[in-house]
């Protein structure tokens, strides 16, 4: 199964959920019905989506602490989606190296976010990693 592609799909679904306010189950089911799903790790995708949903307050507080002077409400929806995924992986998915989460998030930002957002995303994630290591 392709983790990189699964991470990209998870990001797209998380973004869709943030816009449409549909349930995780409905969003995943709709995706499966309308897209090619071969080589996707839906166990990982669902774990990420549910984990972020269940830990949103904690994740957002960590992002806000790490984004120096930026409130969550000021961060674009796509950037906050990418940051939430990276933060979830950093704090809750201990089998995923922090550097992998950081690199994948920066690549997603380069592909989907505003032109120079990847540097903002990279800086926030660096701070998230540092705060996770302080525990």
From Swiss-Prot:
Keywords: RNA-binding, Transcription, Transcription antitermination, Transcription regulation. Pfam families: NusB. Involved in transcription antitermination. Required for transcription of ribosomal RNA (rRNA) genes. Binds specifically to the boxA antiterminator sequence of the ribosomal RNA (rrn) operons. InterPro entries: NusB-like_sf (IPR035926), NusB_fam (IPR011605), NusB_RsmB_TIM44 (IPR006027). The keyword 4Fe-4S does not apply. One of its GO terms (molecular function) is RNA binding. The keyword Zinc does not apply. This is Transcription antitermination protein NusB. One of its GO terms (cellular component) is cytosol. It comes from Clostridium acetobutylicum (strain ATCC 824 / DSM 792 / JCM 1419 / IAM 19013 / LMG 5710 / NBRC 13948 / NRRL B-527 / VKM B-1787 / 2291 / W). Belongs to the NusB family. GO terms for biological process: DNA-templated transcription termination; transcription antitermination.
């Amino acid at each position: 199964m392709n983790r990189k592609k699964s991470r990209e799909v998870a990001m797209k679904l998380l973004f869709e959920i943030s816009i449409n306010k549909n349930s995780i189950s409905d969003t995943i089911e709709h995706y499966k019905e309308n897209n090619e799903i071969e080589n996707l790790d839906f166990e990982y995708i669902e774990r990420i989506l549910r984990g972020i949903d269940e830990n949103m307050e904690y994740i957002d507080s960590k992002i806000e602490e790490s984004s120096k002077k930026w409130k969550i409400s000021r961060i674009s929806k796509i950037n906050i989606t990418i940051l939430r995924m990276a933060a979830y992986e950093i704090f809750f998915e201990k089998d995923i190296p922090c550097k992998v989460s950081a690199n994948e998030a920066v690549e997603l930002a380069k592909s989907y976010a505003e032109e120079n957002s990847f540097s903002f995303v990279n800086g926030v994630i660096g701070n998230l990693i540092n705060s996770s290591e302080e525990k």
